[in-house]
From Swiss-Prot:
Name by which UniProt lists this protein: DNA-directed RNA polymerase subunit beta'
Sites where the protein binds Zn(2+) 1: C60, C62, C75, C78
Protein species of origin: Streptococcus pyogenes serotype M28 (strain MGAS6180)
Entry's family note: Belongs to the RNA polymerase beta' chain family.
Domain of life, source organism: Bacteria
């Protein structure tokens, strides 16, 4: 076997007959499988041991040679080689076909490769191959056309007319093989190239297609006649096994049935030929053989599929590769692994951030080999077998050993569905009793886990390297930030939020107000003994907290705070300011001066003067965590998070916040509001009956009335709510629920959607406290059911979107430090009409500048070129009034097969500059796909009938953008740059005409009458600007403008959809995806290169081809950029392994084989498929060959020395 980590590329070609013979270990002549009495394989049958190797290790078939010492001997009695039984997975056989047979992939695929090679229609081919017509191979001196078809009758007539032997015509695959042998590739290619110079229309398209196939054969060295088989390989028997079931019956792979039919028909054909049977019988047998081989290769591709028992179609070789259950996706990309287990999860509130609880019996099974090794090392048992028995008996001593073994040995926890990389994290195991895994409550958000019965899987990294990577790169305490937006993903939730909210509340006039304490301990003592309340405002000596960053003016004073806040601040990192107010000013600039007593001032006076602060809510805690991370990085942050969690749980327990029906308030003026609404609706209906409004207007007015009534109730609810009400506290703190839940409990449920999505006019007037009537209950079931079905559909859609995104971007890896490009991207805030969807500050953070940025007024240089823009710098730039900045962007990066560090910027998951080897493509795909389920499914109608455009939003719009489809409600765009001179309406055709005067000429655009205009007369418009509301069709924009403007447009559109749903995603992720959609060009004119016109190729390959020609002084080729949807882009990737494992497996492999494609294994997927370590992260070539050395022996290498990775050309290493 070849070592998988040594080879660098993998090629697929057509197999020549000699190649098939060289693979084969013998011919399979009989259809028999195994003998039903002896259960031994039959000689010369499909499981023959002579051909395929022994069924038992080191043992021949007759038993003369047993044991390993006879290795390599071929038995003289039975002819079987003594070797390992696993050769039955590798050795192939063959069948000598008595008549040539066409390969169905090349004849039936679209486009038919055989048809293109011979310039015959697939229909004609089918008639010849399946013996319905003769084809003229060599007309000799007769006036017959070569390749023309003759029916049986015409053939006989022509024979009589011209005499026997005057021309050659045959039928069946044999005829096709003769024709293919006669194809002169070089001559045909030259002819087609000539034809292309003049041809146009359909003729040109066909010529380009034929040229493509012929050129592929010419360059790859494959011969066209190999598309017809004379010899059929038989795959190894262990890949099509036959196993005995209980009860003596056998279960065999379908392939055995299919092979058996081929062999039967082939043998019968041989006998008929020997007997010189009549032509028609032989023909029929040849046709049946052809059909049998077709079924074996791809059952069901042509005609009715061959069925097994119970009319189930048999699974052919093609089906073994295809689809989710096929070889690629089931066994190569998704293997089951050893050392794993799964169990229900329960909450582990006492765990540290980096720990998880593992049940004892699970741990002993997972760590069995480690425990056994220790048992032997400690000499509790003499050998491994005895140690194993000890573990299985459950000896008392194994538990102490287990404790030792798992110390510092991280395990991985995974929850399905793994939507982003935070779905697998590493923890240190802690042994617990019970049978459920214990999970730290703060990592739940990353996993999207809850404890209502979720299950999780646990995996053990075995090797030292795997453990090191798990500990350093995957430990849960390291994953504070979410890779999609760089915001903390471990924010406290529910009880923890509630506890800290209650703790930081302030209240006037509670016991102990105005007391002054010398330090924290005294304050806590007073609180514990009932002298001071948590919420009462008290004084504390500032000097008792010397490590806090006080201003000089604040030292040696007394500060007014609450006992709760003293406890709250006690867990904060030392260098953070003392937090009094839940706002960013206090967090970043320090405690406000108004809380400090001047010498001799009365504390009660100050307390009375101060406003009562609102408590700290979930959002404020999130900000504190983000600030902590920014200042102190992961270790301190995770320790702080644990303290926050413990404090929150402790105080939410102490507070004893409960919910009863009496906690839901009654709104005093509900009846008045509802009566007023009824009255208004009555008036609207009256007006409608009088004909003063249309039915649509009435519907809109009625629904608006009820919506306003609901809002009025909500407003009243907020005005009258008691801040100490537990439900209000839960809602206000962000622990659970929101105002809409609250208003359904206390206000009214309001309008409901009918099953067709239209909103019903009858609202639900009751709330849950009063209870719903039967009719109201019935109405509300529509909405509930729609919610459930929508969610289910959305999950599947979103999952498929993620899969396509991952596939198209999986080979984008950070390959080098700096690509040295001189291009950049000009960015400004993204706006949607008047609203800003993404501010400039957000877009600048963590990117490198392309040019220096100057202050617009003073002209001072704020930041130089090629510098990293930090959060503070971004704020400084925006505050200076700069509106647009040119940055380094993924769009303009010049790195091949990836991106460079400077064009990418910081890694959002760590907040530091991205490292070479980071798989940014996969991260981008996950970041866009993971929030997919939060997007809505609906296609909105804009407020009734105002416009005729349906605006697609949510998930369908994202799919529309990434698949580069023509959008619904397309906008009209201008092709000329200039001014709008007039807009005239034409009532007869119900259209408007827009005239744009450019420098070169006048552009005239017809838009529908109802379309909303975006421009007015006198407006200046650029090329590609939208004249009407709606989405621009990106392919059209690409024709009118350039690649960069299309990329910018797509980026802005994706961001609009996500931001409108309140989901933040870093620009760079969208940039990576959009760049992949635009990485191909189509060759228009080949110039002096040997490219073919109409070929799709990578931009980098195209530039290379041109570079050589320009250097030698020739004419370079010209090309056009092509925008491809992500599905198409994945299938057009350079790696055939990646494309085949994605979709349309047979088509991809057919095409790759004809071209003799080489897969250079640059992406992640290809390497996973062949079982090689992936070329990202620590698997990159530059990191693979580093030998570990002791720190003092060598100077630490400067990181820039390691950063410039050459993108290697792939051949044998």
């Amino acid at each position: 076997m070849v070592d998988v980590n040594r080879f660098k590329s993998m090629q697929i070609t057509l197999a020549s007959p000699s190649k098939v013979r060289s693979w084969s270990y013998g011919e399979v002549k009989k259809p028999e499988t195994i003998n039903y009495r002896t259960l031994k394989p039959e000689r010369e049958g499909l499981f023959d041991e002579v051909i395929f190797g022994p069924t038992k290790d080191w043992e021949c078939a007759c038993g003369k040679y047993k044991r390993i010492r006879y290795k390599g001997i071929v038995c003289d009695r039975c002819g079987v080689e003594v070797t390992r039984a696993k050769v039955r997975r590798e050795r192939m056989g063959h069948i000598e076909l008595k008549a040539p047979v066409s390969h169905i992939w090349y004849f039936k695929g679209i486009p038919s490769r055989m048809g293109l090679t011979l310039d015959m229609s697939p229909r004609a081919l089918e008639e010849v191959i399946y013996f319905a017509a003769y084809v003229v191979i060599d007309p000799k001196d007769t006036p017959l056309e070569p390749k023309s078809l003759l029916t049986e009758r015409e053939y006989r007539e022509k024979l009589q007319e011209y005499g026997h032997g005057s021309f050659v015509a045959k039928m069946g695959a044999e005829a096709i093989q003769d024709l293919l042998k006669r194809v002169d590739l070089a001559a045909e290619i030259a002819e087609l190239k000539e034809e292309l110079k003049s041809a146009s229309g359909q003729k040109r398209i066909k010529a380009v297609r034929r040229l493509d196939v012929l050129d592929a054969f010419n360059k790859s060295g494959n011969k066209p006649e190999w598309m017809v088989l004379n010899i059929l390989p038989v795959i190894p028997p262990d890949l099509r096994p036959m196993v005995q079931l209980d009860g003596g019956r056998f279960a065999a792979s379908d392939l055995n049935d299919l092979y058996r039919r081929v062999i039967n028909r082939n043998n019968r054909l041989a006998r008929l030929l020997e007997l010189n049977a009549p032509g028609i019988i032989v023909q029929n047998e040849k046709r049946m053989l052809q059909e049998a081989v077709d079924a074996l290769i791809d059952n069901g591709r042509r005609g009715r599929p061959i069925t097994g028992p119970g009319s189930r179609p048999l699974k052919s070789l093609s089906h073994m590769l295809k689809g989710k259950q096929g070889r690629f996706r089931q066994n190569l990309l998704g293997k089951r692994v050893d050392f794993s287990g799964r169990s229900v999860i329960a909450v582990g509130p006492t765990l540290k951030m980096y720990q998880c609880g593992v049940p004892r019996e699970m741990a002993i099974e997972l760590f069995k080999p480690f425990v056994m090794r220790e048992i032997v090392a400690k000499e509790y048992a003499g050998n491994v077998k005895a140690a194993k028995r000890m573990v299985e008996r459950g000896d008392e001593r194994i538990w102490d050993i287990l404790e030792e073994v798992i110390k510092e040995h991280p395990v991985l926890l995974n929850r399905a569905p793994t939507l982003h990389r935070l779905g697998i994290q590493a923890f240190e195991p802690v042994l617990i009793d019970g049978k459920a895994l214990r999970l730290h409550p703060l990592v739940c958000e990353a996993y999207n886990a809850d404890f209502d019965g979720d299950q999780m899987a646990i995996h053990v990294p075995l090797s030292e390297e795997a453990q090191a990577e798990a500990r350093l790169l995957m430990l849960a305490a390291e994953h504070i930030l979410n890779p999609k937006d760089g915001k903390p993903v471990v924010t406290p939730s529910q009880d923890m939020v509630l506890g800290n909210y209650y703790l930081t509340m302030e209240d006037a006039g509670r016991e102990g107000e105005g007391m002054i304490f010398k330090d924290k301990d005294e304050a806590v003592m007073a609180y514990r003994n009932g002298y001071a309340h948590l919420h009462s405002r008290v004084g504390i000596a500032v000097d008792s907290m010397p490590n806090k960053p006080w201003k000089d003016s604040q030292r040696h004073k007394i500060m007014v705070t609450t006992v709760g806040k003293i406890l709250f601040n006690d867990i904060m990192p030392e260098d953070l300011p003392y937090l009094q107010e839940p706002n960013n000013a206090n967090l970043t600039e320090g405690t406000p001066d108004k809380y400090f007593l001047e010498p001799g001032q009365d504390i009660q006076e100050v307390i009375d003067r101060l406003d009562i602060n609102v408590p700290f809510k979930k959002k404020n805690l999130g900000n504190i965590i983000a600030e902590t991370f920014k200042r102190f990085r992961t270790t301190e942050t995770s320790a702080f998070l644990d303290r926050l969690k413990d404090l929150g749980y402790y105080h939410s327990t102490l507070a004893g916040l409960t919910v009863g029906i009496a906690d839901i308030p009654v709104i005093d003026n509900k009846a008045e509001i509802i009566d007023a609404a009824h009255h208004r609706v009555e008036e609207i209906n009256k007006a409608f009956r009088r004909g003063l409004m249309t039915d649509d207007d009435r519907y809109v007015a009625v629904t608006t009335t009820w919506r306003e009534a609901k809002e009025a109730l909500e407003k009243r609810l907020i005005e009258t709510q008691d801040p100490k009400n537990p439900i209000v506290m839960m809602m206000d703190s962000g622990a659970r629920g929101n105002i809409s839940n609250f208003s359904q409990l206390a206000g009214m449920r309001g309008l409901m959607a009918a099953p067709n999505g239209r909103i019903m006019e009858l609202p639900i007037l009751s709330n849950f406290r009063e209870g719903l009537s039967v009719l109201e209950m019935f109405f509300s079931t529509h909405g509930a059911r729609k919610g459930m079905t929508d969610t289910a559909l959305k999950t599947a859609d979103s999952g498929y979107l993620t899969r396509r995104l991952v596939d198209v971007a999986q080979d984008v890896i950070i390959r080098e430090d700096d690509c040295g490009t001189d291009r950049g991207l000009l960015i400004r805030a993204i706006t949607d009409g008047k609203e800003v969807t993404e501010t400039l500050e957000e877009r600048l953070q963590g990117r490198y500048t392309r040019k220096s940025v100057k202050h617009p007024e003073t002209g001072e240089v704020l930041i130089g070129a090629d510098q990293l823009i930090t959060e503070d710098m971004a704020r400084k730039i925006v505050d200076a009034g700069v509106e647009e900045v040119t940055i380094r962007s993924v769009f303009t990066c010049a790195t091949r097969h990836g991106v460079c560090r400077h064009c990418y910027g910081i890694n959002l998951a760590t907040g530091d500059a991205v490292e070479v080897g980071e798989a940014v493509g996969t991260i981008a795909a996950q970041s866009i796909g993971e929030p997919g389920t939060q997007l809505t499914m609906r296609t909105f109608h804009t407020g009734g009938v105002a416009s005729n455009t349906d605006i697609t939003q949510g998930l369908p719009r994202i799919q529309e953008i990434f698949e580069a489809r023509n959008p619904k409600g397309e906008a009209v765009i201008t092709e000329v740059k200039g001014n709008v001179v007039e807009i005239e309406e034409d009532a007869s055709t119900r259209t408007k005409k827009v005239y744009v005067q450019g420098k070169t000429g006048m552009g005239e655009y017809v838009v529908p009458f109802t379309a909303r205009m975006k421009v007015e007369v006198g407006d200046e418009v650029n090329r590609g600007a939208a004249l009407t509301e709606g989405s621009i069709q990106p392919k059209r924009l690409l024709e009118v403008r350039d690649t960069l403007s299309v990329e910018t447009y797509l980026l802005a559109e994706v961001q609009k959809v996500y931001r409108s749903q309140g989901v933040e995603i870093g620009d760079k992720h969208v940039e990576v995806m959009v760049r992949q959609m635009l990485r191909k060009v189509r060759v228009m004119d080949p110039g002096d290169t040997d490219l073919l016109p109409g070929t799709l190729m990578d931009i980098s390959d195209f530039t290379d081809a041109n570079k050589d020609i320009v250097i030698s002084g020739g004419i370079p080729a010209t090309s056009r950029p092509v925008l491809m949807g992500i599905t198409k882009a994945s299938l057009e990737t350079n790696s055939f392994l990646s494309a085949a494992s994605f979709q349309e497996t047979t088509r991809v492999l057919t095409d790759a084989a004809i071209r003799g494609k080489k897969d250079h294994l640059l992406g992640l997927k290809e390497n996973v498929i062949i079982g090689k370590i992936i070329p990202a992260g620590t698997g990159m070539a530059r990191y693979r060959n580093i030998e570990p050395q002791a720190m003092n022996e060598i100077e630490v290498i400067d990181h820039t020395e390691v950063s410039a990775e050459a993108v290697f050309t792939a051949e044998a290493e």
